[in-house]
From Swiss-Prot:
This is RasGAP-activating-like protein 1. Its cofactor is Ca(2+). It comes from the Eukaryota. The keyword Translocase does not apply. Keywords: Calcium, Differentiation, GTPase activation, Metal-binding, Phosphoprotein, Repeat, Zinc, Zinc-finger. The record marks 341 as: Arginine finger. Ca(2+) 4 binds at residues 149, 202, 204, 210. GO terms for cellular component: cytosol; plasma membrane. Residues 1-105, 116-231 form the C2 domain. The gene is Rasal1. The modification Phosphothreonine is found at residue 400. Ca(2+) 2 binds at residues 21, 74, 76, 82. A zinc finger (Btk-type) spans 674-710. GO terms for molecular function: GTPase activator activity; zinc ion binding.
């Protein structure tokens, strides 16, 4: 039984942060750590004590993780960043409420003695002889200790306490992965029982030693199950700091843990779901999909939609699934102006489908224009209430401009950017994924059939543009970081420019139906350009759905990442491991990397025809590298194995911590199916005849640090896993099981009220046949859920 977990994290905002700069303000950002591994960094909000981030992350991780931490720092352009405070959440605290955490949490001070990490390997034996008890503690090694020295390492030693006695190991200099292999023996008087405590310290020549962590074992543990293995280091027990003086963060955190059964156990549920999409949708109230839509609340509907879309994508049935939901939605809609405007399961499913299969397409269309807006930083404003004439003067004019001058200049800039956006969209038909085009064609046909009158001639266009423009292009323009179009959020001026562009794209997506209405009359100068663009968009939508329905969108089961699909690309600094070579920072060379569904390739420039490729099937590990290995930050390693079984390591330096984590995540997901993955590797470099991490002298020595192949960031390129998605659907149905049982009772009571001698067609309530179908479908579904629940219990007992 496979085990998986994912953390949904939203860093919303901060309040009442302390000032760290002489100006009386701060430049705060937030680091997100999972078990001491940095997985994300928010943008820096300049000159603010109440920053708004609004950043979301999904982290896939193993079930044995321990804690999640948020560190708030003040960015300094010179010197080290100042630590403001931290929030630490244990796994138990996150799972205490099934809905997760959604609240303001006070920041607490960062106590160096509480900042511990890593593990220690011990083998403890309790012996008895005529002189009393003897405890033999074999201190083997430790790994991933906290760096306490400026070099990014420590000088660790272990101190063992038992009763009134204590002993120390030797000190090993400049390593976070010490190998002691020392046996310490302590004696205790007969008749006494004492706990065992092992502390790790960093030795300092000047000043006091720094605490690295501790483990403690009760007398009962020593007697019944003497410790032997790896043990996680813990901080000294201390009183909790209620905080408040350092400000607070508003966080949303939810942990989802699943134990995924073998595929055959989900087959009955899958058959029920597949039967749903193959049956009539308009009056369906009995299928599992119809019941799921009824049970799903607004809060979880988006997550459910994502799981269902992925499940049917993995089965090659995303088209029929979306068509089923579309037919249900259209049949229930009387006013075409409200079609797909709600957050129904149909709307959310189509929205998630666009993000899953169309993200690469979105990047190709919008990235060039978005990059121009960020880089050129032009001032644009049409609203006279928001015009800043002084800013316009600094940027565009020699003298003091008038509102009319600002409006004319802004209109020219805005139409220029908007023209580039429209040109990119209407010329992108050939780049739009086939699966998306087929889904839009089915959508248009269904809408056209329902609203066929001449007065509804635009509805077939609005149905598509409502998704493609209003739920895809416009949100990506408004918040490009959330769609991975930029690494940072926009500054206020650029954000306003993006808002104006997004409003214009929304107006085009609405086919100009609301032009001249509402309070934003200041957009009137833009109307001629918008009306001109709308006719081009209609032609584009006609071309988009002009596709042969017999074509298959990626075969029987559609993969999100095809072999030729570029998942990630950009410049990195590269260095290959060379036996006998000098591990210096000058050995890194700038290369342009592309990660596809087939390989990791690189060349001197993006246009360079000659490139070197690393097949994904050869990758055995993708891991962080300690900063001290090359005196460089943000370095990772890709460990590969050739046909002869020889290992090779390529070191890559990324531009920042987010770039590093995104490359790590993308490479780990791309190489996830590979056999023979390494369970440990070296986070350092081999130079001067030894590894910089663990100081071992053999180049071929076994790795000293565990690999983290299971830790990845969730995004559109996540591999499809139908079993995991089926498990998520089962979990959602399980939450609504009581409602299903209540529905079954209601249907049964209604059925008894139907007069058998009366024609069912004349009955005011539901007919007997429909009630019987509902009761049978609900009973069948409840039985499937019960069978799955029993299977989980059986596997739980075995494990």
């Amino acid at each position: 039984m496979a085990k998986s977990g994912s953390l949904s994290i939203r860093v919303v905002e901060g309040r009442a942060l302390p000032a760290k700069d002489v100006s009386g303000s701060s430049d705060p950002y937030c680091l997100v750590k999972v078990d001491d591994q940095v997985v994300a960094r928010t943008a820096t909000i300049w000159r603010s004590l109440s920053p708004f981030w609004g950043e979301e992350y999904t982290v896939h991780l193993p079930l044995d993780f321990h804690h999640l931490a948020f560190y708030v720092l003040d960015e300094d352009t010179v010197g080290h960043d100042d630590i403001i405070g931290k929030i630490s959440l244990s796994k138990e605290a996150i799972t205490a409420d099934p809905r997760g955490i959604d609240s303001w949490i006070n920041l607490s001070r960062v106590d160096p003695d509480a900042e511990v990490q890593g593990e220690v390997c011990l083998d403890v034996k309790l012996l008895e002889d005529a002189r009393g008890r003897c405890l033999r503690c074999h201190v083997r090694q430790a790994r991933d200790l906290a760096p306490r020295d400026i070099s990014g390492t420590s000088d660790p030693f272990a101190r063992v306490f038992w009763g009134n006695h204590s002993l120390e190991t030797s000190t090993i200099k400049k390593t976070r992965f010490p190998h002691w292999d020392e046996v310490l023996e302590l004696r205790e008087a007969p008749g006494t029982t004492s706990p065992l405590r092992v502390e790790l310290w960093d030795w300092d020549m000047v000043g006091k030693n720094d605490f690295l962590g501790m483990v403690e074992f009760t007398p009962q543990t020593l007697q019944q199950k003497p410790p032997n293995g790896w043990f996680r280091l813990l901080p000294f027990p201390r009183a909790e700091d209620s905080g408040g003086s350092l400000g607070a963060l508003r966080l949303k955190v939810r942990l989802t843990e699943d134990r995924v059964l073998p595929s055959q156990y989900y087959q009955p549920l899958m058959e029920l779901l597949l039967e749903s999409v193959q049956g009539p949708a308009e009056e369906d109230t009995t299928s599992p999909l119809a019941l799921l839509e009824e049970l799903a609340s607004g809060d979880c509907r988006q997550d459910l939609a994502t799981k269902l879309v992925k499940l049917f994508l993995g089965r090659g049935l995303a088209g029929p699934f979306l068509d089923y939901l579309t037919r249900r939605e259209v049949a229930r809609t009387n006013d075409p102006n409200t079609l797909f405007r709600s957050n129904s399961l149909a709307s959310k499913s189509m929205e998630q489908f666009m993000k899953l299969v169309g993200m690469r397409y979105l990047h190709e269309v919008l990235r060039p224009v978005i990059s121009r807006v960020f880089e050129e930083k032009k001032y644009m404003e049409l609203d006279p209430c928001k015009m800043d004439l002084n800013r316009s003067r600094r940027i565009s004019f020699k003298g003091t401009p008038t509102e009319e001058q600002v409006r004319e200049t802004s209109l020219g800039l805005l139409t220029g950017y908007l023209g580039s956006v429209v040109d990119a969209i209407v010329s992108s038909t050939g780049r739009c994924p086939l699966a998306l085009r087929l889904a839009f064609k089915q959508l248009q046909r269904c809408v056209e059939k329902r609203f066929s009158g001449i007065e509804h001639q635009d509805v077939k266009y609005l149905a598509i543009s409502g998704f493609l423009f209003l739920r895809f292009f416009a949100p990506a323009i408004l918040t490009p970081k959330l769609f991975d179009l930029r690494d940072q959020h926009a500054d206020p001026q650029t954000s306003r420019s993006l808002l104006l562009l997004a409003k214009a794209v929304q107006s085009i997506g609405n086919l100009g139906q609301q032009l001249g209405q509402g309070k934003e009359q200041w957009l009137a100068p833009l109307h001629p350009f918008l009306l001109q663009s709308i006719s081009r968009v209609r032609d584009f939508l006609d071309q988009l759905v002009d596709v042969d329905e017999d074509e298959e969108a990626g075969g029987p089961a559609c993969a999100l990442v095809q072999p030729s699909t570029i998942v990630r690309e950009g410049f990195l600094l590269k260095r290959k491991e060379e036996p006998g070579g000098l591990a210096t920072r000058f050995a890194f060379k700038k290369r342009y990397f592309r990660l596809s569904g087939r390989d990791l390739s690189y060349s001197k420039t993006p246009e360079w025809q000659v490139h070197t490729s690393i097949p994904l099937s050869c990758i055995r590990a993708v891991e962080h590298v300690d900063e001290g290995a090359f005196q460089l930050p943000h370095v990772m390693q890709v460990v590969t194995q050739d046909g002869a079984g020889t290992s090779h390591t390529t070191y890559l330096q990324c531009k920042n911590v987010n770039d590093l984590n995104q490359w790590l995540s993308a490479l780990r997901k791309a190489s996830a199916p590979n056999p023979g993955k390494l369970v440990a590797c070296h986070p350092g470099a081999f130079r001067s005849g030894r590894w910089t991490c663990c100081l071992q002298a053999e180049r071929s020595a076994a790795g000293c640090s565990r690999t983290h192949s299971a830790i990845t960031l969730g995004d559109w390129s996540d591999p499809l896993d139908p079993d995991a998605e089926a498990q998520a659907v089962y979990r959602q149905l399980l939450l609504g099981r009581d409602q299903l049982r209540l529905k079954l009772l209601e249907d049964s009571s209604l059925d008894t009220e139907v007069d058998p001698g009366r024609d069912s067609s004349a009955t005011d309530g539901p007919c007997a046949e429909v009630l019987a179908q509902q009761r049978a479908a609900t009973t069948h579904l409840l039985q499937v859920l019960e069978d799955l629940e029993q299977a989980h219990e059986e596997f739980q007992k075995r494990g």
